[in-house]
A protein has these predicted regions:
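C-terminal ends and interior cores of transmembrane alpha-helices
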Residues: 91-113, 295-307
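Helix-loop boundary and gating motifs at the non-cytosolic
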Residues: 17-59, 63, 231, 237-249, ...
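Residue-level signature of mid-helix packing/kink "hotspots" within the transmembrane helices
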Residues: 63-67, 71, 166-167, 266-270, ...
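Hydrophobic core of transmembrane alpha-helices in multi-pass small-molecule transporters
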Residues: 27, 111-133, 312-325
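C-terminal membrane-cytosol helix-exit motif in multi-pass small-molecule transporters
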Residues: 191-209, 391-396
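Helix-to-loop junctions at the C-terminal end of transmembrane segments
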Residues: 69-81, 272-284
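Cytoplasmic helix-loop-helix junction between adjacent transmembrane helices
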Residues: 125-161
Length: 413
């Protein structure tokens, strides 16, 4: 029995077998990715004795490969379903883990670029393609199968699993490396993504109507979801800055453990996702988006002047609650705006703006920090969500998406 038939029989049910399978697969896949990503810096510096610029280059390769591969995957999931590409993304991550393991013994290096091992470059690129393929397919599955009346709530619950995976992976990776070594870490990560691949095979969908999105492998944006995607970008730019510069900012101000900011973000976002998705479904998407983005901006501004652990924790709570309130509603709005056969392309566009936000956030923030200092980075990061809110409200006022309301007359945007 397919997930859509189940949804038709229980039109308001979120926790179906398909939702459980894609959620557990995401938990395994995201845990693997966090194990890999949080170990790259240690691997490059400790194992290969290379500089931190190589770490940045490898992360850049991963993000670029993720960005470029999202668009064809989005189009293909609209035509062929999510199961094949969720499985394929997990399978590619297994190959990435194998490449990381082999790089420990096969150290053939590029003749340029400071002697970076070829297998490290390959592994990073594969992990980027795996990330975008799996996450686009999983998001598309959610977009097609959850009930419209509980769409933002379902996206929020799905995000809880991603948050748990991030906390789990980031929390144990260094422990595994110190106790068992890099080879064991990548073996464990590979086993986790094998589990994700097997769970993905259990996903079931009905055949989809023919997509209007042109077939191909090019760079194609879904124009209908540009507005919520840009709003997402305005928030993610600050997030990219946070991962890169909050540890440096905290240490420069005498805070011994600025990483408490990330702990506060993780805990508060999980709690918020469990509670705030219903607001967007019952009161409209903007009832969650606007306050969520404003609270995120407030949190970033607190970071700009934080000089104690308590201030970093307070900022983390604000950012966690704000982002976890706004992001599911933005994603749900993007799904709402997509045609019924183009939700894969819509999710690819939405998450591509997220990838681009991480890339540009880290790069531009570095330039700002060099010129004006670390505090200024987070003042700018606080302004960006406010600009995003203003732009989204302007778009809403000018466009008044009547087509959306015609497709889903019970929905309030």
């Amino acid at each position: 029995m397919t997930s859509r038939i189940l949804a038709a029989r229980s039109p308001h049910r979120v926790f179906t077998l398909g939702f459980a399978l894609v959620g557990l697969a995401t938990l395994a896949q995201a845990s693997c990715l966090m194990l890999v990503n949080t170990s790259i810096g240690l691997l490059v510096v400790r194992e290969f004795s290379l500089g931190p610029q190589v770490v940045g280059a490898l992360i850049g390769i991963q993000a670029t490969c993720a960005l470029l591969s999202r668009f064809p995957v989005g189009s293909w999931t609209d035509r062929y379903g999510s199961r094949l590409f969720a499985f394929g993304g997990a399978a590619l991550m297994v190959l990435s883990c194998v490449a990381f393991i082999l790089s420990l013994s096969i150290r053939a290096a590029m003749p340029i670029g400071g002697g970076v091992p070829i297998l490290l470059i390959l592994a990073s690129g594969l992990s980027g393609v795996a990330l975008s393929t799996f996450s686009t397919a999983a998001s598309t599955y959610i977009a097609y199968t959850v009930p419209i009346s509980r769409r933002a709530e379902a996206v929020g619950y799905y995000g809880v699993l991603q948050g748990l995976a991030q906390g789990l992976g980031a929390g144990v990776s260094i422990v595994i490396v110190d106790g068992l070594g890099f080879g064991a870490l990548y073996a464990i990560a590979g086993l986790a993504t094998v589990v994700a691949a097997l769970l993905s095979l259990g996903l079931r969908e009905d055949s989809r109507r023919e997509s209007a999105t042109p077939m191909g492998v090019g760079f194609r944006l879904h124009r209908g979801v540009i507005a919520p995607s840009l709003a997402q970008y305005s928030v993610i730019v600050g997030t990219g800055a946070a991962f890169s510069f909050i540890p440096l900012l905290g240490i420069s101000r005498g805070v011994t453990n600025p990483g408490l900011y990330f702990t506060a973000v993780a805990i508060s976002s999980i709690v918020a996702r469990l509670l705030t998705g219903r607001i967007a479904d019952r009161r409209g998407r903007f009832a969650a988006i606007v306050p969520g983005m404003i609270v995120t901006a407030v949190g970033m501004y607190i970071v700009s002047s934080a000089s104690t652990a308590e201030a970093f924790i307070l900022a983390g709570v604000a950012v966690g609650i704000g982002f976890a309130t706004a992001q599911p509603a933005l994603q749900a709005l993007a799904i709402d705006l997509a045609g019924p056969a183009e939700r894969g392309a819509a999710m690819a566009t939405f998450w591509a703006f997220t990838d681009f936000g991480v890339i540009t956030g880290s790069f531009v923030s570095g330039q700002i920090a060099a010129v004006s200092g670390l505090g200024t980075v987070f003042v700018v990061s606080a302004v960006m969500p406010l600009v995003g809110v203003a732009g989204l409200l302007g778009w809403r006022q000018l466009s008044r998406p009547a087509a959306l309301l015609l497709r889903t007359p019970d929905l309030t945007v």
